[in-house]
């Protein structure tokens, strides 16, 4: 009768959990179906430019001009047209950016995102409030989220719980705004933070031959054969177009030389005194002249500049910026005076104007573009780059202060590197904590022989996991991380996506390593903040003598399946829509209890509190039966290499002490440990080494003491025969 009631209770509990999960999925997914009657982008335009007209989208970046009558008021565009930088979710955030004609940001508004913490968690209004900081910022200014060593930078506060998301938004807004402003001619091209341009030493001149200039790197050469050019088009639609015959592959396609003419030792030796003086007189401050000379069948000038005014076959690149040349930047070069110079079929001088902020002391590349026609109006381009570095004796570098050097280094670092620098304290503390945990795990046999010390150490570690890893560093791993990783593997995997959150990245690396060595238990028992919170609450309940309830093992074993079903459902939803899967992943209370510290809508808080209340009476109910992350880790845990949890042949038959004491019921009645369920608390190992508690060990010690007291060899008792 009792058994039947238990099975009925288990069935009811299982049905309730599944029903609750389905209800939660439906409720959170339904919130994404709200229709928008009025486009948000038009609302923002009406707010900042009331009564203005909007042109059709134009150019590579689909920029729309905002006008009122004949007056241009500004420009509107979407960041997705400029950069597709992935955010924390692995997908880009789309921002509508409004600029005024002076290159000042009027508005930056988030149109679309897939960020889990913002979809359900942090109110979206907090992100909109963050974006309001960009109003009034010039596109050439540097904006930093958090601290910065650059005193000239504009610093803005992050959104708690969404630091990575807003740092990506900052990168997207400033990069897109600057790129479009340059394209529109509102600001000068160039990076917003770079070294101070070096100065050309006009006092340094030495008569030098062509051979010497080539030898010291002042003149650079790029020789391309027809075969090399054909090979560059392999794998494109232009493969096989205009290819050279086998005997023609070694023929010269172009033999190209380039140099910077401003240094007197180069310019005067090549152009002669008068031609060099005329050239320098026509250059404005900050402008630089370059000579390009070539032989071969390919013309670096082409004929495009005649029709469109732009040279489409040759350009310079420095600091990631492209320096294009127009017909007004071109001077015909016919007379060259350098001793030993070969004859050239084609020669030209190009001028980089002051707006490009060219630095003669920094490396640059001459880029040669080669085009092949693949259709009536379609062409395929490939490029060949020739690097150039100015010899040091021709320039003078302007020394930078320590602050300027630090600011330049910070500005030129990738986004994920800056995030690691900003979170260096959290990273350092967590690395030390993981090192301590590694020592505990490798020396577990020593630690478990001192149970009182190990229990205090473990409880302290769990407090650290909840307070520091969870609530401070926001290092709560989630099944969403797993789904994102799986989708990244089959789509567009980029390491920087996972490196943007250093705490999560480090914890995942350690968790992956620990799974291979010991199974899922190390993370679930030591590093999961919500799991640690449950365990500490349950420990307090036991101290208060609150009754504890455990299901019969046969029922408990069958309820394990729920978490695997939850994982499969989430994975199936993610195949259809990752956004829906992120909403459905609210079956995890992690975001509520850890990331947002219970600061969200009451129904989410009620769900998390409900799980913690159940945990008072039965330890880690959520972890045992519902957690999809634990299910995913358990599946990968089957690849573990070692089994360091020791057992005796008497474990399970007849001894049941460890099985009865295991707080998560991970030990089967027959004595073996189920590593899919074990949380690696090491309680069973403390019992294993406890000479006053482990029955087989007690019996073994009794035998040893008895054997020690027994004589080593039988002693003969002397007998004296007495005659009668």
Curated annotation (Swiss-Prot):
The lineage of its organism: Bacteria, Pseudomonadati, Pseudomonadota, Gammaproteobacteria, Pseudomonadales. This is Regulatory protein NosR. Transcriptional activator of the nitrous-oxide reductase gene NosZ. It is a peripheral membrane protein. The keyword Phosphoprotein does not apply. SUPFAM superfamilies: 4Fe-4S ferredoxins. It is found in: Cell membrane. GO terms for cellular component: plasma membrane. Residues 215-234 bind DNA. The keyword DNA-binding applies. Keywords: Activator, Cell membrane, DNA-binding, Membrane, Transcription, Transcription regulation. One of its GO terms (biological process) is positive regulation of DNA-templated transcription. InterPro entries: 4Fe4S_Fe-S-bd, FMN-bd, NosR, NosR_regulator. To P.denitrificans NirI. It comes from the Bacteria. The gene is nosR. One of its GO terms (molecular function) is FMN binding.
């Amino acid at each position: 009768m009792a058994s039947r009631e238990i099975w009925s209770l288990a069935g009811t509990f299982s049905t309730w959990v599944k029903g609750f999960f389905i209800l939660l999925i439906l409720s959170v997914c339904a919130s994404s179906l709200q229709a928008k009657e009025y486009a948000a982008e038009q609302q923002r335009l009406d707010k900042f430019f009331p009564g203005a007209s909007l042109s059709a989208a134009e150019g590579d970046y689909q920029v729309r001009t905002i006008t009122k009558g004949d007056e241009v008021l500004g420009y509107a565009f979407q960041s997705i047209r400029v950069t597709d930088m992935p955010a924390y979710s692995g997908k880009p955030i789309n921002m509508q950016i409004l600029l005024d004609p002076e290159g000042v940001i009027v508005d930056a508004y988030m149109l679309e995102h897939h960020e889990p913490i913002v979809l359900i968690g942090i109110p979206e209004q907090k992100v909109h409030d963050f974006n309001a900081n960009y109003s009034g910022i010039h596109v050439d200014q540097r904006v930093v989220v958090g601290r910065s060593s650059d005193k000239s930078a504009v610093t803005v506060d992050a959104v708690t719980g969404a630091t990575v998301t807003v740092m990506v938004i900052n990168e997207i807004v400033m990069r897109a705004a600057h790129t479009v402003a340059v394209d529109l001619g509102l600001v000068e091209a160039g990076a917003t933070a770079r070294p101070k341009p070096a100065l050309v030493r006009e006092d340094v001149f030495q008569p030098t031959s062509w051979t010497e200039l080539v030898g010291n790197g002042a003149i650079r050469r790029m020789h391309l054969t027809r075969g090399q050019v054909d090979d560059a088009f392999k794998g494109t639609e232009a493969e096989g177009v205009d290819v050279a015959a086998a005997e023609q592959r070694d023929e010269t396609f172009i033999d190209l030389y380039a140099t910077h003419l401003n240094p007197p030792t180069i310019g005067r030796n090549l152009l002669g005194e008068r031609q060099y003086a005329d050239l320098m007189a026509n250059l404005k401050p900050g402008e630089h002249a370059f000579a390009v000379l070539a032989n071969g069948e390919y013309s670096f000038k082409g004929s495009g500049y005649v029709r469109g005014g732009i040279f489409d076959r040759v350009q310079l690149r420095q600091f990631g910026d492209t320096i294009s040349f127009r017909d007004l930047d071109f001077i015909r070069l016919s007379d060259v005076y350098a001793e030993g110079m070969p004859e050239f079929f084609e020669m030209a001088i190009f001028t980089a104007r002051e707006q490009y902020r060219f630095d003669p002391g920094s490396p640059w590349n001459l880029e040669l573009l080669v085009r092949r026609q693949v259709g009536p109006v379609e062409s395929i381009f490939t490029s060949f780059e020739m690097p150039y570095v100015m010899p040091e004796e021709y320039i003078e570098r302007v020394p930078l202060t320590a602050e300027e050097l630090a600011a330049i280094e910070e500005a030129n670092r990738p986004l994920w590197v800056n995030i690691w620098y900003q979170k260096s304290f959290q990273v350092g503390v967590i690395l030390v904590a993981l090192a301590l945990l590694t020592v505990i795990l490798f020396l577990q046999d020593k630690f478990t022989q001192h149970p009182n010390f190990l229990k205090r150490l473990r409880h302290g570690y769990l407090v650290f996991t909840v307070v520091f890893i969870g609530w401070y560093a926001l290092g709560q791993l989630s099944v969403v991380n797993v789904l994102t990783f799986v989708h990244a593997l089959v789509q567009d995997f980029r390491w920087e996506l996972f490196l943007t959150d250093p705490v999560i990245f480090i914890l995942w690396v350690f968790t992956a390593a620990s799974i291979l060595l010991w199974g899922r238990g190390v993370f679930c028992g030591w590093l999961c903040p919500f799991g640690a919170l449950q365990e500490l609450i349950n420990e307090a309940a036991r101290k208060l003598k609150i009754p504890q309830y455990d299901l019969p093992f046969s029922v408990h074993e069958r309820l394990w399946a729920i978490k695997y079903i939850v994982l499969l459902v989430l994975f199936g939803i993610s195949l259809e829509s990752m956004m829906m899967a992120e909403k459905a992943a609210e079956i995890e209370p992690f975001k509520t209890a850890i990331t947002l510290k219970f600061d969200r809508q009451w129904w989410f808080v009620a769900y998390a509190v409900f799980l913690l209340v159940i945990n008072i009476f039965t330890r880690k109910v959520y972890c045992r039966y519902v957690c999809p992350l634990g299910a995913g880790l358990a599946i990968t845990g089957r690849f573990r290499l070692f089994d360091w949890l020791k057992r005796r042949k008497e474990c399970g038959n007849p001894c049941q002490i460890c099985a009865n004491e295991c707080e998560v019921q991970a030990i089967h009645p027959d004595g073996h440990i189920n590593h899919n369920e074990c949380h690696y608390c090491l309680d069973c190992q403390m019992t294993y080494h406890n000479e006053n508690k482990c029955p087989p060990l007690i019996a073994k010690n009794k035998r040893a003491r008895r054997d020690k007291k027994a004589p080593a060899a039988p002693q003969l008792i002397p007998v004296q025969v007495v005659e009668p």
